[in-house]
Amino acid sequence: MSVISMKQLLEAGVHFGHQTRRWNPKMKPYIFTERNGIHVIDLQKTVKLVDDAYNYVKNASQEGAVVLFVGTKKQAAEAVKEEALRAGQYYVNHRWLGGMLTNWNTIQTRVTRLKEINKMEEEGTFEVLPKKEVVLLNKERERLEKFIGGIADMPRIPDVMYIVDPHAEQIAVKEAKTLGIPVVAMVDTNADPEPIDVVIPANDDAIRAVKLITAKMADAIIEGRQGEDAAEDFVAEEAASEESLEELAEIVEGK
């Protein structure tokens, strides 16, 4: 039973890759065909690999894993934050700061500072400070919240990372590899799949595609933590239907 259907993938545009001239040859096993200068991802493989990723994340969640969602480009930022929070996990959805994981202790000093500023406001300190100082503190807090707010309560270095577009998030991938953190990722046709532990071949530039796959990873965490009935919008499909395959063929033929 698959957790995602061919129809869902088609409707979200998961099959559209990059221009052929921008491809990474290592993605060849995941490419169905090429049409009008664009690579088309093999969705039959994507269905299977989403299942693999779902089970991997679910099993990690059952063991109490801390999962970090990463996606800093505009197409991914909102979904990464929303789905990480829905799953009770953590996220980075603005620029990845070099050393965010490999320099964990230094990053924690900034987390402490963010919490200090929040505490000052909660305790009424802002009310007795000069307005100019409050303005500066709010600016500092806004910047800290933007870059590290999503990991402020993360109890430790993550056990698993889910990344949207490892090509754009190469620093995050390198840090994960340095620390031995397994990476699950949406990998488009322009990226190198080799550093990724669990590859999900998919269009990582379409908001709907990113939302669909990212939501499934959140569902996996929730199911792992709470049981089979907890994940939202669970869709089961024995295999890709002939109708879906015909629809894909029509799309790539431009009909």
Swiss-Prot record:
Disordered as annotated region, ranges: 233-255
One function term, GO molecular function aspect: structural constituent of ribosome
UniProt keyword Metal-binding, yes or no: no
InterPro entries found in the cross-reference section: Ribosomal_uS2, Ribosomal_uS2_bac/mit/plastid, Ribosomal_uS2_CS, Ribosomal_uS2_flav_dom_sf
UniProt record, GO biological process: translation
Keyword field: Ribonucleoprotein, Ribosomal protein
One of the record's GO cellular component terms: cytosolic small ribosomal subunit
Pfam families associated with the record: Ribosomal_S2
NCBIfam families: rpsB_bact
Family: Belongs to the universal ribosomal protein uS2 family.
Protein known as: Small ribosomal subunit protein uS2
Gene: rpsB
